[in-house]
Design a protein with these regions (language model features):
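N-terminal Rossmann-like FAD-binding beta1-loop-alpha1 element of flavoenzymes
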Residues: 7-32
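Short hydrophobic core segments
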Residues: 9-11, 178-189, 302
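Conserved Rossmann-like nucleotide-cofactor binding loop
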Residues: 16, 39, 189
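Active-site substrate-recognition segment that forms the wall
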Residues: 22-26, 51, 82-87, 188-282
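Glycine-rich FAD pyrophosphate-binding loop
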Residues: 25-45
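Helical element adjacent to the flavin cofactor pocket in flavoenzyme catalytic cores
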Residues: 143-174
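C-terminal catalytic lobe of FAD-dependent flavoproteins
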Residues: 253-338
Length: 338
């Protein structure tokens, strides 16, 4: 069936579902997005807007790179009145042990082979990148200056929503949707419609300060071993997640910074912290389980699902991240989860 005559229903008006709807409509499909609460009402409404190409698996490197290229001119693509404000602050991944540094070396080698300008840095250079960073107990780290974040990521979600035919309706059964194809992109709620998929809620909390005039933390700093990530936004607010004690131990200048504002959300996590993409059965497709990196990959995922549904194309990501991998023992663990 051609794209011009195909009717597609998308369940979920988060950034992934809306991106899929955008790419389907761009290729001539008739698309309706069903959402039970509101545009960006789930994880897409609270995500901090980070975009990076530093990953430990080939599939994520490719999805992130394509998405970053798409985002480069997102304001023109979506006819946005508001500038979403991309800031290339850089991402610094810290390694506290030789084992963690060895994993970062493997990841950087993979990234470099795919055109990502990341590199391993010694503790002395980490101290230059992040003034006042305590490096005595660091083995090194990985750095990419081109990674960054959007000041207003929700503006992108809203712009995608404005271009879509979004209907507030709770889909209780896929049988009620009479479209030629159905895509379930409902994040943590996906198992309500596809209970066979191993997606579970993983609570996350973001803490924010009031605006601070002084720039205390310029790049985004991540410590997977100590369980935290932090950055300072363009408006001066400090944004942090995870272990505050570990954060101030590594960055003593932040010890007196209060973080009175809390934003609670959930990751739609899978056993390997990778998305589930592809056909589930007959006319039913899924794009969920992004484990916190849906915004970073949404543009590429939209293109891949649209081409698969309308043109029968099978992207590499559909082979790697297919729903059957869990039952078949083909998990693809991602080592660089924040």
């Amino acid at each position: 069936m051609s794209g011009e005559s195909k009717d597609v229903a998308v369940v979920g008006a988060g950034v992934v579902g809306l991106s899929i709807a955008f790419h389907l409509a761009e290729r001539g499909a008739s698309v309706v997005v069903y959402e039970r609460t509101g545009i960006g009402a789930g994880a897409s409404g609270v995500q901090p807007g980070g975009v990076r190409r530093q990953w430990g698996t080939r599939v994520n490197c490719l999805l992130a790179a394509e998405s970053l290229r798409w985002y480069a001119d997102v304001r023109e693509r979506l006819r946005m009145r508001v500038d979403p404000g991309f800031r290339a602050c850089g991402y610094l991944f810290l390694a506290h042990s030789e084992g963690a540094l060895a994993q970062l070396r493997r990841s950087v080698e993979l990234q470099n082979g795919l055109g990502v300008p990341s590199r391993i840095v010694a503790p002395a250079e980490e101290a230059e990148l992040v003034p006042d960073l305590r490096t005595e107990d660091l083995a090194g780290g990985a750095w990419c200056a081109e990674d960054g974040y959007f000041d207003r990521p929700q503006a992108i979600v809203e712009a995608l929503g404005a271009l879509a035919d979004v209907r507030l309706h709770e889909v209780r059964s896929l049988a009620e949707l009479e479209a030629d194809a159905v895509v379930v992109a409902a994040g943590v709620d996906t198992p309500r419609l596809l209970p066979e998929l191993p997606i579970r809620p993983e609570p996350r909390v973001l803490e924010l300060s009031d605006p601070i005039r002084e720039r205390l933390l310029e790049p985004l700093v991540v410590s997977a071993e100590h369980g935290f990530a932090a950055k300072q936004l363009a408006d001066g607010r400090l944004l942090a997640s995870g272990d505050r004690a570990a954060l101030v131990d590594l960055l003593p200048r932040l010890v007196h910074v209060a973080l009175p504002h809390r934003v609670e959300g959930v990751y739609d996590a899978t056993p390997d912290h990778q998305a589930i993409l592809g056909r589930v059965r007959d006319r039913v497709w899924v794009a969920a389980g992004f484990s916190g990196h849906g915004f970073m990959q949404a543009p590429a995922v939209g293109r891949i699902l649209a081409e698969a549904i309308l043109e029968g194309r099978e992207d590499e990501a559909l082979r790697v991240l297919d729903p059957a991998r869990f039952a078949e023992g083909r998990l693809v663990p991602e080592p660089q989860i924040v």
